[in-house]
């Protein structure tokens, strides 16, 4: 038996041409996702056809109270898995009324790099592995963990099945299907090493699209956990001690790296990353020093290293890439709370320009 509220939520709106567009943007902390909805007269498939909008930037730490208006520019459209039909999710970035980007608009900065002719010619692909931890809402302690206590040591939980090893799978599967419905290039999902921690992947996507897709996938995950009364944490080290942290490993390749002989170019790119190690670390996520300790499948934050199939290195090259002499590499330094606009554009800038 359905409730009156669920009946209203599932109302059939097919008799109206109007749609609901949920405008999504990033708040002042760089990790808080905000959104609000508006009615449009009919279906829209191109973001350039969407109206700009505004919001109170003084309530998101992005503007002063006496000049609080911040303008949203629609940039990417995805199907809305919550309202369904012709309703849409709209990824936006933020600008001052005069037209200049607000300081926290990393998307605008990234587009400049991805629009550079040398970068465009290389068709940079990014695949991002987003790890996260599910927490009980009232106590902010991982799902499946005894209240105030700890589960058994790590080992049985990675890609595991069973009620004593996998906690929150319904959320993971709902998120997976919602992302597919929305048109996101979600490539997979799996349980992680620490119990209560999971991962989903955005498959190789060109340029700025990888950042747009990861932010919308995060938004969908936040909405699903909201419905379930669970908190999703992107903290890179949510539990101190002998537990794995949470990362956003970023896989990268260029057109040249994907061709025969590309392994030599991958090695050259890795050398460039080593030279700018400190600059990348500074932009790879807040609190990352708690994760990058040299333990739990990480490299020490102060030391750059790379290796084939080495998950304790800063950068990993896969066995298949080594064997075929072409392919991609994985930057294992970005934390789970990184800004993908910043990370992807920095990798492209350092290795191509």
Curated annotation (Swiss-Prot):
Top EC class, one word: ligase
Q: Per the record, what is one GO cellular component?
A: chloroplast
Output the GO biological process annotations, alphabetical, semicolon-separated.
Answer: glutamine biosynthetic process
Q: Which residues carry this modification: Phosphoserine?
A: 3
SUPFAM superfamilies per the UniProt record, alphabetical: Glutamine synthetase, N-terminal domain (SSF54368), Glutamine synthetase/guanido kinase (SSF55931)
Where does the UniProt entry say this protein principally localizes? cytoplasm
Every GS catalytic domain range: 106-353
Entry EC number(s): 6.3.1.2
Where expressed (tissue)?
Not expressed in roots.
Q: Which UniProt keywords apply?
A: Acetylation, ATP-binding, Cytoplasm, Ligase, Nitrogen fixation, Nucleotide-binding, Phosphoprotein
What reaction gets catalysed by this protein? Answer: L-glutamate + NH4(+) + ATP = L-glutamine + ADP + phosphate + H(+)
Q: Where in the numbering of this chain does the GS beta-grasp domain appear?
A: 19-99
Q: Which InterPro entries match?
A: Gln_synt_N (IPR008147), Gln_synt_N_sf (IPR036651), Gln_synth/guanido_kin_cat_dom (IPR014746), Gln_synth_cat_dom (IPR008146), Gln_synth_gly_rich_site (IPR027303), Gln_synth_N_conserv_site (IPR027302), Glutamine_Synthetase (IPR050292)
> What protein name does the entry list?
Glutamine synthetase cytosolic isozyme 1-5
